[in-house]
Structures are given as C-alpha cells and as structure tokens.
Curated annotation (Swiss-Prot):
Species: Gallus gallus (Chicken)
Transmembrane annotation, as ranges: none
Boundaries of every Acylphosphatase-like domain copy: 13-103
EC number: 3.6.1.7
Protein name stated in the entry: Acylphosphatase-2
Family membership noted in the UniProt record: Belongs to the acylphosphatase family.
Length: 103
C-alpha cells in the first residue's frame, strides 16, 4: 500500500502519556495549538502523577506527526523524558470534533 493511500484512507487513534517536566510549562496549551495546526482531534490533560495524558485521532500521517511532536518537541520550557503510546488502532470515524484541554 502506498503512503498516499494510507494517508488519505486510514484514520488512527492513539492514547499518550508524556513524562518529564511537562506541568507548569504551558504543555497543554502548546499541545492544543499543535493539534489544531496539524488538523488532528482529541484531548489533553494533566494527571496527579505529574504527567500529561490524552488521546489523538486523525489521518495516520497527521497522528504520526503529532506523536513525533509529543515525543521530541513539546512546549518551549518543557523537558520530555519519555512518551508512552498505547491503544493505537485504526478507527472508522473520529470520536471528537476538535482538540480540547480537559481538567
């Protein structure tokens, strides 16, 4: 299957948790901004364990770009030690209409 076919026909969903210095550094705001730029949907929130967690859905190539951003970039003041992805699957439709911060 060509990359073009995969990009246009396949929707993905993935859960994530980001570890490191990711709270109190505008991580959620930058995550929401990046998601909107890429055109993916889902959510982000702080956890009581000091991590940031959430879910991303969208075309496979856009979800992969967001995974890369969550693993390597983050907000300017953040320090990402590691990012754990789970429950990655192909979906038939999006569960969200936008990207939001949860509290």
């Amino acid at each position: 299957m060509s990359a073009l076919t995969k990009a246009s026909g396949s929707l993905k969903s993935v859960d994530y948790e980001v570890f490191g210095r990711v709270q109190g550094v505008c991580f959620r705001m930058y995550t929401e901004e990046e998601a909107r730029k890429l055109g993916v949907v889902g959510w982000v929130k702080n956890t009581s364990q000091g991590t940031v967690t959430g879910q991303v859905q969208g075309p496979e190539d856009k979800v992969n770009a967001m995974k890369s951003w969550l693993s390597k970039v983050g907000s300017p003041s953040s320090r990402i030690d590691r990012t754990k992805f789970s429950n990655e699957k192909e979906i038939s439709k999006l569960d969200f209409s936008g990207f939001s911060t949860r509290y």
